[in-house]
From Swiss-Prot:
Pfam family name, one: Aconitase_C
GO MF entries: 3-isopropylmalate dehydratase activity
A single Gene Ontology CC term: 3-isopropylmalate dehydratase complex
Keywords of the record: Amino-acid biosynthesis, Branched-chain amino acid biosynthesis, Leucine biosynthesis, Lyase
Record-linked InterPro entries: 3-IsopropMal_deHydase_ssu (IPR004431), Aconitase/3IPM_dehydase_swvl (IPR015928), AconitaseA/IPMdHydase_ssu_swvl (IPR000573), IPMI_Swivel (IPR033940), LeuD (IPR050075)
PANTHER family: 3-ISOPROPYLMALATE DEHYDRATASE SMALL SUBUNIT (PTHR43345:SF5), 3-ISOPROPYLMALATE DEHYDRATASE SMALL SUBUNIT 2-RELATED-RELATED (PTHR43345)
Catalytic reaction annotation: (2R,3S)-3-isopropylmalate = (2S)-2-isopropylmalate
Quaternary data: Heterodimer of LeuC and LeuD.
GO BP, sorted A to Z: L-leucine biosynthetic process
Protein's recorded name: 3-isopropylmalate dehydratase small subunit
Length: 200
């Protein structure tokens, strides 16, 4: 997983609250067997409307989504995070996230930054008044900068550490590779063993 320290990109004002995972990516797209290529599925129902924010320039090139409260509610769906990342988003700002979405985001390298709703409102106005405005999300200082607006954001220390180090679940496991190898070397031969992956 790529490390996240600081990202600057076009901000996208999504004035919508209670955006659930089925709105982020409808269930029909969950039949795919790969982890990539979901950008066409992101907000697919809403993108049929020509006035939707991602159908407008320069917002269609955005990488920082500024959403309303209660983003990512509904079912646990890693595909929702994959779709956001495949489209090009690196961070989502909201005053409240569903816990399961926040957890999935941190494991996949998408920053879910919890920003006070008053600051979200100010950022929305800035982005709407000056489309194409860049938003900088700095994970080290836990701040968001948009024009003259500087706002703090909240994120738990563990998720912040994982993002700064670029550690997904596999990366975390591989930090203990030497211990795992040493344990398996002493494990009785009649017990199951982990075999190396075959590369073809």
């Amino acid at each position: 997983m790529e490390k996240f320290t600081k990202h600057t990109g076009i901000g996208v004002p999504l004035r919508q609250s209670n955006v659930d995972t089925d709105q982020i990516i409808p269930a029909v797209y969950l039949k795919r067997i790969t982890r990539t290529g979901f950008e066409d599925a992101l907000f697919s129902a809403w993108r049929k409307d020509s006035s939707f924010i991602l159908n407008q320039e320069p917002f269609n090139a955005g990488s920082v989504l500024v959403a309303g409260p209660d983003f990512g509610t509904g079912s646990s769906r890693e595909h929702a995070v994959w779709a956001l990342k495949d489209y090009g988003f690196r961070a989502v700002l909201s005053s409240r996230f569903a816990d399961i979405f926040r957890g999935n985001s941190g494991k996949q390298g998408l920053l879910a930054a919890q920003v006070a709703q008053d600051d979200i409102e100010l950022i929305w106005k800035e982005l709407e008044n000056a489309p194409g405005t860049q938003v900088t999300v700095d994970l080290e200082s836990k701040t968001v900068v948009c024009g003259n607006i500087v706002a703090p954001f909240e994120i738990d220390d563990y998720t912040r550490w994982r993002l700064l180090e670029g550690l997904d679940d596999i990366g975390l496991t591989l930090q203990h590779e030497a211990d795992i190898t040493a344990y398996e070397a002493t494990r009785p031969s009649f017990k199951p063993k982990t075999l190396p992956a075959k590369v073809s």
